[in-house]
């Protein structure tokens, strides 16, 4: 899959673009841990604290994040995406409309060459943190929307004493992303446990995250067991996570992970748009729905912490595909090649009078 950087025009200057929207970018999230409710553009401190802090994990170009911020001026929306160019464009979107309750994380200043590093360093444009009425839309009311049921505050997490479970291979629990050699200059990873204090988040949103269908990349999914365990201490009392995706296999996989991580499902839907028609759109969601995608959704809150954490679910998303692939009206994003290969194989088996191939559960 091409990165955002690979699609940039020849004259694109990250440094110049960064300087124009740096007030909405935070390059040292750890400096704000425990006091995000006081953040203001440019890394200044606001007078009145935000009522909630919401993390949009995998925010892309920020259309959804900024739209939510416009609807809920009393809530701070913190966005993070693995691609620094997407983060830049999200900050530009926030700057363009002038919202003061949206900020986008970069784990340090990304490297795009000497021109970029020099431009950012000389400008000093790094938000590192020195010392209207809410919409009546059903979509974003934190009290009754599946986005969140949060009522807690910092330090009020039911799992405040938990140590995030680390993945044996990469120790990435609570890491937002892991990517090697990102051409876009994106950070290799970000450790959410250093960016947010215990119980600081009122909600954690995951909108159309990358599904990583292959078994060997399952640990990169935002709803992987180790990551879900890492989110628990960061969620305040009554807070939860919400997933929206076009992928039924990812939704079903996520249900297994939530159960293993001790979360309680508070809401699920096979068509989120029917239940929440006024919810903000992102360009990515519009693209998928125009292709025939239905939006699946889950909301969950941490329940009692499991005594023993063990991965027992099938990890390949192929294991969550329906038996009859010919009845699949929409193929989830990222699985088109796999489904086409399986359909072709089944067609050949039928032509030979043989039983159709069914991939093993792995």
Residue ranges and their predicted role:
Residues 1-50, 266-362:
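SAM/dcSAM-binding transferase cores
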